[in-house]
Amino acid sequence: MDITFTIFAQSLAFAALIWIVATKIWPPLIKVIEERQQKIAEGLAAADLGQKELAQAQEEIKKTLKNAREKANEIIEQAHARAHQIIEAAKAEAITETNRQQNLAQVEIEAAAKRAREELRKHVSILAVNGAEKLLKREIDVNTHKMLLDELAAEI
């Protein structure tokens, strides 16, 4: 065989192979590659969209948490203010009740002192009358007089 014919035959076979690959095999491969590229592009776009949505959700969570903390602090502050009001009201009520009880006790003490004075006056007057009776029943001499006065003083 001649080398030219071999080269020519191989060239024809190679050209036929190129034509078969270009017409029968290449278009489906290109189609599959393009579909795969499109799926990858869609996946990347979806991932980007997911990242954006995640960032937005995180921002919303931060805002919600901030609002919740502010509301919680506000509620706590209101509770402290209410507790302070209740304490102040209880203090005022306790002071009022203490003053009322002190006034009642003072009135009771004054009444008891007055009763004691009256009782003491009655007792002293009875003792004075008894002492005078004893003095009048006995002879009045200095020693007897002194003894009776000492007894009277001891009873008082």
From Swiss-Prot:
Alphabetic keyword roster: ATP synthesis, Cell inner membrane, Cell membrane, CF(0), Hydrogen ion transport, Ion transport, Membrane, Transmembrane, Transmembrane helix, Transport
CDD domains, per the entry: ATP-synt_Fo_b
Domain of life: Bacteria
Topology within the bilayer: Single-pass membrane protein
Segments passing through the bilayer: 3-23
Disulfide-linked positions: none
Location in or out of the cell: Cell inner membrane
SUPFAM superfamilies linked: F1F0 ATP synthase subunit B, membrane domain (SSF81573)
Recorded GO MF terms: proton-transporting ATP synthase activity, rotational mechanism; proton-transporting ATPase activity, rotational mechanism
GO cellular component: plasma membrane; proton-transporting ATP synthase complex
Alphabetical list of Pfam families matching this protein: ATP-synt_B (PF00430)
Function: F(1)F(0) ATP synthase produces ATP from ADP in the presence of a proton or sodium gradient. F-type ATPases consist of two structural domains, F(1) containing the extramembraneous catalytic core and F(0) containing the membrane proton channel, linked together by a central stalk and a peripheral stalk. During catalysis, ATP synthesis in the catalytic domain of F(1) is coupled via a rotary mechanism of the central stalk subunits to proton translocation.
NCBIfam families in UniProt: ATP_synt_b (TIGR01144), PRK05759.1-2 (NF004411)
Assembly description: F-type ATPases have 2 components, F(1) - the catalytic core - and F(0) - the membrane proton channel. F(1) has five subunits: alpha(3), beta(3), gamma(1), delta(1), epsilon(1). F(0) has three main subunits: a(1), b(2) and c(10-14). The alpha and beta chains form an alternating ring which encloses part of the gamma chain. F(1) is attached to F(0) by a central stalk formed by the gamma and epsilon chains, while a peripheral stalk is formed by the delta and b chains.
Protein family (similarity comment): Belongs to the ATPase B chain family.
Protein name: ATP synthase subunit b
Organism: Xylella fastidiosa (strain 9a5c)
Gene label: atpF
